[in-house]
Amino acid sequence: MKNPLSQALRCWSEWRRQQKLHGRFAFGDARMQLGRVILPARLHTWTASSRLANEADITRADDAWQVRLHDSGLSFFWPSEPDQNLHFVIEQEFSAANPHHYTTAPVRLSPESTVLDVGACEGLFAFRAINEHLASRVICFEPSGRMAALLRRGAETNGLADGIAIERSGVGSQTGRARMVAGDNPDAGYLEYLPSGDSHPDAVPVTSIDDYCRSHQLALGPGDLIKADAEGADLDVLLGAGEQIRNGAPQLAITTYHVDDHAERMIAWLRQTRPDYRLRLKGFSFWTAKPRPVLLQASTLR
């Protein structure tokens, strides 16, 4: 069982450490939804179940579950029977109070924006971006064949397929092949690179953002966005976009909670590569026993 005082002190200590390292972690951003982080999970289970029942209709749809959201009218498909945790998947896309929400300031999108969605999973972020005219197109990278198929199904069900491209590929620091390792949840799988020449029945292609943009004659600019939730490969995604970041300064929204030192390493690299970025670090997560910042955002727009 969580000890709230102990958890709060550990978050305070980590916030102080981050402040000393780079000074880019406002206290208000560090304490976003802190009660959810430090209090016992059972206190949130009932609330999440109740909210999920009120915000969505969930029905079996062949080999998946269709989730229809009341407020937005959007639907997405989930591969396993949903539980109360699905509420948090929905909340992070529609509530700016959630530190995992990708499009808070300093990120600013427009109907002309191009978004690269790395780790698109069920596609709810992409659906919202097109539906709310936050972007003209979203290129979704999803290495899981199962999730990529459900993502496509959701795009077609919502009538948004024209604005969404789906690449069944992982994204990392280099182009190659990797095997997809399934996680305990549909949004918690990860990629493991294969040595050159090796094969594996679950192997999937992996690209870097720079290689992808080069091969597709795509140049990202300050109004575009790289969004990434890459289950631990987030720093590799960033490093593999170095050319686009140096030349075009696209906006960034990248998760930082999968690996202990990702937040500070990303900030150090971005300060060296594009010192004109405005940076924002948000929230805490106990993904493991140590509290880690949730999300890093960057933009040169004023």
Provide a role label for each language-model segment.
Residues 156-158, 181-186, 269-273, 297:
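Short, hinge-like loop/turn segments at secondary-structure boundaries
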Residues 146-157, 265:
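Short alpha-helix adjacent to the SAM-binding motif of class I
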Residues 135-140, 147, 211-302:
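Conserved acidic-Pro-Pro-aromatic motif
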Residues 1-135, 139-141, 150, 277-302:
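S-adenosyl-L-methionine
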Residues 121, 144, 172, 233:
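Conserved glycine-rich SAM-binding loop
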